[in-house]
Amino acid sequence: MPYRKAEIRPFREDDEAVLFGLASLDRGADSRTIAVLERETVFVAEVEGFPAGYVALTRAEDAMRIDQLFVSPEHEAEGIGRQLLEWAEGYAISERATRLQVVVEAENRRALDFYRGRGFTEAGENLLELHLPESIS
């Protein structure tokens, strides 16, 4: 698949049903997914005006944690996940976080490879983290 440039924007209330559907396609969505979408900082990747993925972030002391990062199956291998991750990194730096963290189950080899390939290292059981530069602002 070719690289597709996504427009990344903040979550809007009318995104909830579509993003819940995206989460359902990946690992099954539930009431926790709704809570994440309603309470956390969520950014949506749009391709040609339609949501192609999202990342949900929450503060964890001096770190920013990726709670969910999903890409629509029809947009896999187009760079959408990488763009969302880069956006999450930038947001975390702007919020003065020192680390970006994500919990990944040991059997999720694809996700482990994705994050490790972008510089994340082991920080605990199922926890990966990326040390961030200081914000210059």
Regions found by a protein language model. Give the residues of each.
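Accessory recognition modules or surfaces
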Residues: R82, S135-S137
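Conserved GNAT acetyl-CoA-binding A-motif
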Residues: A92-V103
